[in-house]
């Protein structure tokens, strides 16, 4: 298993897919990393040479990933809450932040529906 940015990449997958296991790296970023490192997208993680691994590591180190990225996202949310913005209030209340309607849906954000006693009459 190749270990990049503190994440063990699955050996049997292609490197372009394996890189997406790192938080903060999606499909397009993974392709850019491999292009800059000069590594083929079709090569499997187990077939990487140590030199190729090091080139990929150098490219990944230039991007904010994993713990640093998670910390920045949580700090951004905390900042929104502290300044009392609408988005911060929605985060604090556990409701959708991006303007979605909540009359019928938003179960993922709001949690499981709670029945109200004697509601039906």
From Swiss-Prot:
Keyword flag 4Fe-4S: no
InterPro entries referenced in this protein's UniProt entry, alphabetically: Rbsml_uS13_C, Ribosomal_uS13, Ribosomal_uS13-like_H2TH, Ribosomal_uS13_bac-type, Ribosomal_uS13_CS
Position of the signal peptide: none
One GO CC annotation: cytosol
One record GO biological process: translation
UniProt entry keywords in alphabetical sequence: Ribonucleoprotein, Ribosomal protein, RNA-binding, rRNA-binding, tRNA-binding
Lineage: superkingdom: Bacteria
Any one GO molecular-function label of the UniProt entry: tRNA binding
Stretches for region Disordered: 88-121
Subunit and partners: Part of the 30S ribosomal subunit. Forms a loose heterodimer with protein S19. Forms two bridges to the 50S subunit in the 70S ribosome.
UniProt family annotation: Belongs to the universal ribosomal protein uS13 family.
Cited function: Located at the top of the head of the 30S subunit, it contacts several helices of the 16S rRNA. In the 70S ribosome it contacts the 23S rRNA (bridge B1a) and protein L5 of the 50S subunit (bridge B1b), connecting the 2 subunits; these bridges are implicated in subunit movement. Contacts the tRNAs in the A and P-sites.
Protein name as annotated: Small ribosomal subunit protein uS13
The organism of origin for this protein: Limosilactobacillus reuteri (strain DSM 20016) (Lactobacillus reuteri)
